[in-house]
């Protein structure tokens, strides 16, 4: 097993994930099957579903699809009872720390946390019960230039095995470009196989929101899912646009089962009518023909 060469191989010294490569470059062994990953999106301390592209710093928006009257702990407890591992809590702006801690305390080790994560606070969120921390904007400067030193600090602080890199993106002339700052600012980084190869040794997973379709319930970005599935070397979760069970099946088909999916606004527990939570719980409990686990360890 080996890590990527060059300057990236120096990051974290001893904390880097080595990726075992199969005949087609995949580290996931056995039959791959797309899983449902739950989410708790927090805005102003409440569980909400919003249109991703409507997040702004200018006081306008966001466009809210749903505002829950239930506490974050209610959702976390349901995810725990149904063994829906690998979900994420996302803090959308300030005023969400207490709500995030409430969710994490309800299921210690069962949820990831993202939103305002940096090397300075990552450890405290792991101590609060997060299984992993999710980071995007902290890896770029104000102009969208990638900060190698920041990734080095994070890997040294918590280890690559506790880090999820969020490469949420927008469609551009070059394909898909990573967007930061609540998806308002495009960075210098495109989502390509080369980018994934470059970053994979330094994280446990990738989380990728298709920001242009997030919250619209008009279908997934199948081209992006296909690109991610064709790579498939470490776990990847896609979010954006899933409106029906057919969209979940499209993620399974387009990625050959190598990409997991998050569903938000279309889900009945978030006020939607396109997807039923219980159906997705049952989906995760299905087994491949040989009876092996969905994503074997």
Predicted regions mapped to residue ranges:
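Conserved beta-strand positions in the central sheet of alpha/beta enzyme cores
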Residues: 88-89, 134-135, 164, 207, ...
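C-terminal helical cap(s) of enzyme catalytic domains, especially alpha/beta-barrels
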Residues: 145-146, 151-154, 249-254, 258, ...
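Conserved anion-binding
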Residues: 47, 53-58, 130-213
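Conserved, mostly hydrophobic/aromatic
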Residues: 41, 125, 165, 206, ...
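N-terminal active-site wall of soluble small-molecule enzyme domains
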Residues: 57, 68, 72-128
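Charged helix-capping and loop-helix junction motifs
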Residues: 147-151, 188-193, 218-227, 276-278
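Glycine-rich, proline-tolerant flexible connector loops at the mouths of alpha/beta enzymes
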Residues: 84-99, 137-143, 209-217
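Catalytic cores of alpha/beta
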Residues: 103-106, 111-112, 117-129, 223-257
């Amino acid at each position: 097993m080996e890590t990527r060469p060059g300057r990236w191989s120096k990051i974290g010294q001893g904390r880097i994930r080595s990726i075992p490569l199969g005949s087609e470059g995949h580290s996931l062994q056995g039959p791959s099957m797309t899983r449902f990953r739950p989410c708790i999106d927090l805005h102003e301390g409440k569980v909400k579903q919003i249109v991703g592209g409507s997040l702004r710093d200018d006081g306008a928006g966001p466009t809210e699809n749903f505002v829950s009257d239930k506490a974050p702990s209610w959702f976390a407890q349901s995810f725990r009872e149904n063994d829906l591992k690998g979900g994420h809590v996302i803090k959308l702006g300030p005023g969400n720390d207490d709500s995030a801690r409430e969710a994490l305390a309800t299921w210690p080790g069962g949820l990831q946390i993202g939103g305002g994560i940096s090397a300075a606070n990552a450890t405290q969120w792991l101590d609060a019960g997060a299984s992993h921390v999710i980071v995007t904007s902290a890896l770029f400067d104000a102009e969208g230039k990638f900060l190698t030193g920041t990734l080095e600090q994070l890997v040294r602080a918590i280890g690559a095995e506790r880090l999820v890199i969020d490469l949420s993106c927008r469609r551009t002339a070059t394909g898909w470009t990573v967007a930061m700052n609540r998806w308002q600012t495009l960075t210098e980084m495109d989502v390509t196989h080369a980018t994934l190869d470059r970053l994979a040794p330094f994280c446990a997973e990738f989380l990728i929101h298709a920001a242009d379709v997030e919250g619209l319930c008009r279908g997934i970005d199948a081209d992006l899912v296909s690109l991610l599935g064709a790579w498939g070397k470490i776990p990847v979760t896609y979010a954006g646009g899933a409106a029906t069970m057919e969209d979940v099946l499209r993620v399974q088909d387009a990625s050959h089962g190598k990409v997991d999916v998050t569903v938000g606004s279309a889900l009945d527990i978030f006020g939607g009518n396109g997807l039923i939570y219980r159906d997705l719980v049952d989906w995760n409990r299905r087994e491949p023909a040989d009876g092996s686990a969905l994503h074997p360890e």
